[in-house]
Amino acid sequence: MKKFLLFVIMTVLAITSVACGKKETQKASAGKGEGDRLVTNISSDPYTLDSAIATDSTSGYVIGQLFSSLYTQDSDGKYQNELAEKEEVNADGTEYTIHLKKDIKWSDGSSITANDFEFAWKRLLNPKTGSMNATEMYFIKGAEAYNTGKGEEGQVGIQVVDPQALKVTLEHPVASIKQKLASSLFIPLSKKSIDDNNKLKTDPKELITNGPFTLKEWKHNQAITVQKNKEYYDKKVTLKEIEFRIIPDSKTAYQLFKSKELDLLSGLPQEMIEKEKENKEYKRVAGFSSYIYSFNVEKEPFTNAKVRKAFSLAVDRKFIVEKLYKNNAQEAYAFVPEGAKTQGGRDFRKEKGDYVKFDSAEAKKLLEEGMKEQGWSTLPEVTLKFTTDTQHKKVAEAMQEMFKKNLGVDIKLENKEWKSYIDTYKQSDFQLAYMGWGGSLLDPITKLDLYAGDGPNNYAKWHNKEFDALVKEAKVEQNEDKRFDLLHKAEDIMFDETPLIPIIFPSFSYLQKSSVSGVQFIIGSSPELRYVKIKK
């Protein structure tokens, strides 16, 4: 399975700096001279190991070690068969019969069959599962009707032909079908890993996986350790163990790397990038990600579009990039990052340009107009919410100063640790809140669809019928140029009404010990670790 920061279409939540938890006395394998154990870092406990429920990058990173899907993305960004042996497609591209590789097994030694895929996919679509990712399967015939209670499970276009073949019927042809099916959403599941309450078992003795690793130990808020799956089909995987240590502070993680307690550091402190960028251990990877602050348009004062736009124009993104990110990011004046291109070479972002800018005079003017429209003599109190991550705190404090200086508005700041913050965000319990959206499918629709109508990720509560119609039409449009034109119109509408403040398009920084090889860095994804080797 390709490693996603969680998958594209559902577009996962991206994190600025990934770090590690309570300090262990054990040195990393590189420091000890061992060749079979990798120690790296993540910023928080995984929210879940259930791909049907996961929407954050940390969960996706760990899930990617434990489970494999039909296809995977290689280091060149191309999609290769993983559990799929071959596929047959009908004339109009609406039926795929996917044949599985022979002798692929679960970690308990039992065979992986087409029934396991059918079970997992229909479980995700089952309304009782409560998956916020179900819309990403709506390209499958009958999936939306079943998920919304308007159809039956038996009408869903997922059919077992025989134990080694799965037939998938689509609502319409999909050009990026392998990209979609490479997602962690489309993994199989063993029924033995699901309890009587339809929950995924997370006890290492009970969780049956099919990826390169199995769960060995999970010490919440300390570390999660995976070990080599002896039943995994790909014998090129030789790494015996990966320990993901959990610390939300990137400086602490950096110190652990420097003291040889980490082999791979994910997320350098911004102030260390300049120092390390000439280091041979330094790696920088582009990300198809957008860091934003989202408005809840149902909460005052952000019920007014002019007020929302005023807050966006009051943000000095150049300062944030230069001073806080040390130029390790790109200023974001739109929502869709660079990198989404047609086969003919059209770059979605470059050909359209910017939607917003830093303009304090215009910001003040719009704020006054918006307040007048609402009949407000004073602006309702505003609280900006963010996570406990050190870098997020710096950005939030900078924005607090910008709103004071450029709008004359005092705002409050409130932060929470990541797992609690996700719950707050999903409940739309905010006026203005940080979020990062990433994914490895370089397609503008993966960003714009987040704000579509009644979609599960539209936490901003923003609705525009014309925007929704354009996004819906783009989902089925097969002509790339026409599709880009539709999505440009959709983004035009988005920034006319401003449901979000774009801040930066980030890149991701790593330090990798010279003794470590085989890490694959893929645009928009977490690192691929299965082929890691460590010199003794």
Please tell me what each predicted stretch does:
Residues Q164, L170-V237, E241, K251:
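Gly/Pro-rich hinge or "lid" segments in bacterial periplasmic/extracellular proteins
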Residues N229-E274:
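Ligand-site clamp/hinge motif
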